[in-house]
Design a protein with these regions (language model features):
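Hydrophobic, small-residue-rich transmembrane alpha-helices and their short perimembrane loops
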Residues: 2-238
């Protein structure tokens, strides 16, 4: 039995992860309460105006494009993750043991999966936050609300915080769970050697998470630079 079998070691991490998810839920409800483009551009009768409609239309196009992009990207990344997991299994099976090989490859896939989940979650919130940040900066004539950059900053900061806490929460949850499972495995050797093997397998989780984050950052940067071919907006557009 590994020397890392104490549940007390991971309890603080589990608690911090749970608090992160609770705070994310609070932020998400706060974001949903912010006005959209249609909400800020209405006449006295409550009919939506052209500017607000255009903001929501552009936001929907960006969101749909982001979903299609992530779907294609994650399809290729799934092949990459499975191929690299198989490679890691083969390398550690040849040099260590089948138990370590399985532990490293499963930890790698787990880290990659949670990292991809955080990226998808962040993209969905970010695309929705774009239009609400624009709406907050535009103000609302119907309710005599002047446009201020501070309102837009508040929305943007709240939206970005969701992604930040999602990364932290999912990371802590994944590392703690992997640590708890790996510490219960029957590795061969003395306590020091067992501890080293546990950390060796746990490193696979970080490797998987970092791999997805690297490709998401590079590919996402390229995607945002692709020319957006659509008819030019009308002169009355914001």
């Amino acid at each position: 039995m590994s020397g890392y079998g104490e549940i007390d070691v991971v309890l603080p991490a589990f608690a911090a992860s749970a608090l992160s998810f609770v705070f994310i839920a609070f932020l998400y409800m706060k974001i949903n309460a912010y006005p959209t483009g249609v909400n800020i551009d209405m006449d006295a009768r409550g009919n939506p105006g052209p500017k607000g409609t255009l903001v929501d239309e552009l936001s929907k196009q960006v969101r749909d494009g982001s979903i299609k992009f992530l779907t294609v990207e994650y399809t290729y990344l799934a092949v990459f993750v499975l191929a690299l997991a198989g490679t890691l299994f083969g390398l550690f099976y040849a040099t260590e043991s089948s138990l370590i090989a399985t532990s490293v490859s499963v930890s790698f896939v787990s880290g990659a999966t949670l990292s991809a989940s955080a990226g998808w979650w962040g993209m969905m919130v970010a695309t929705d936050g774009n239009r609400k940040t624009t709406s907050a900066c535009a103000g609302c004539e119907r309710y005599n609300k002047k446009a201020t950059l501070n309102d837009g900053l508040e929305v943007a900061f709240t939206t970005g915080a969701v992604m930040g806490f999602a990364v932290v929460g999912l990371g802590l949850l994944g590392v703690s769970t992997c640590f708890l499972i790996l510490s219960s495995l029957e590795f061969e050797g003395e306590t020091e050697a067992v501890n080293k093997k546990t950390m060796q397998c746990l490193a696979g989780f970080g490797f998987g998470a970092s791999s997805i984050a690297l490709f998401a950052r590079v590919a996402g940067g390229i995607y945002t630079k692709v020319p957006f071919r659509r008819p030019p907006p009308p002169p009355s557009a914001p």
